[in-house]
């Protein structure tokens, strides 16, 4: 049986610090790796430097949520937002390649019904087709109806 390894989710831990500061804090706290939700406001070269200096890997990142002020929490299952979803997927893959993240959570968003499911499946196929050449795994995160209705 292998050793247990712990990853710090920097979307929840050390949120008062910059993302790079949180990476160093995770190292000091004894974590083995890090992950984060939305790193896009930080220069990926700065993240790469912090990861190299801490000997960490970035487990994964999420695609952008869309218009947070309008209540969006993902774009990939939103009919009519396919162009925006593909842009978010492409951005996440480009960013992940720079920081060497191996997983991307493609955020569905708040939607329901057959059309939303079909749009989500098409966007997931799009993401997989682009990620496979870079050895990046595409993830989904099913959420429960209580915490995130129609996600």
Describe the function of each predicted region.
Residues 1-97:
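N-terminal pre-domain/capping segments
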Residues 75-151:
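Active-site acidic/histidine proton-transfer and metal-coordination neighborhood
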